[in-house]
Amino acid sequence: MLNKIFYIIMGPPGSGKGTQSQRLAHQLKLPHMSSGELFRSAIDSASPLGIKAAEYINQGLLVPDAIVWGMVQEALNQPECQSGCIIDGFPRTLDQAILLNDFFMQSYADYRVIQLDVSNEEIIRRIHSRFICPSCKHVYNQNQGLSECPTCQMKLVRRSDDTLEVIHKRLESYEKLTAPLIDYYQELGKLTRIPSEASPDDVFQSIEACIKA
């Protein structure tokens, strides 16, 4: 596991983590590991961890860190991650961040954290105007004027949790649980903050400059 390098893409909901993670994965030819996709895959395949996670989700409870970390660790140990990967949506709590840092230290793997900074006003505007392809999960903005995914020809839909009420709750949860990670990674010297209210192309150029520095 020597010579690995991982990039953790962080930011509030609607900051563009998924979009920028996918672009960075393509650019660096590294796998893109989305915690959301890990959850969906584990639950859909009824894996042991997926079954346990579903039990909590179905009761409206938070999935314990031990189960979440089990899924992530399993993914990180896959052969395709032997040269590193782009991590999107994890960690979400300080305890998860400590588990991940310990894993990297024990694996002699290097990692960097990129924080996408976006104001709450911009986040609300973005999320309230976005649509997704139910097949490939690509995100589109209503200003693009598309009704179907150009790649999959599937009708674009709005995520059921992209309502103003849910958006505010997600932002509150982020501020409480995930924002403290910024200080943690800053103290470790792992963090780079990227202003991310510009166009996706401009933000990606900033990310490229960051990883080349």
From Swiss-Prot:
Monomer. Its main location: cytoplasm. NCBIfam families: adk, PRK00279.1-3, PRK00279.2-3. Transmembrane segments: none annotated. Its EC number is 2.7.4.3. Catalyzes the reversible transfer of the terminal phosphate group between ATP and AMP. Plays an important role in cellular energy homeostasis and in adenine nucleotide metabolism. GO terms for biological process: AMP salvage. This is Adenylate kinase. It catalyses: AMP + ATP = 2 ADP. CDD domains: ADK (cd01428). One of its GO terms (molecular function) is metal ion binding. PROSITE patterns: ADENYLATE_KINASE. Consists of three domains, a large central CORE domain and two small peripheral domains, NMPbind and LID, which undergo movements during catalysis. The LID domain closes over the site of phosphoryl transfer upon ATP binding. Assembling and dissambling the active center during each catalytic cycle provides an effective means to prevent ATP hydrolysis. Some bacteria have evolved a zinc-coordinating structure that stabilizes the LID domain. It is found in: Cytoplasm. InterPro entries: Adenyl_kin_sub, Adenylat/UMP-CMP_kin, Adenylat_kinase_CS, P-loop_NTPase. Keywords: ATP-binding, Cytoplasm, Kinase, Metal-binding, Nucleotide biosynthesis, Nucleotide-binding, Transferase, Zinc. PANTHER family: NUCLEOTIDE KINASE.
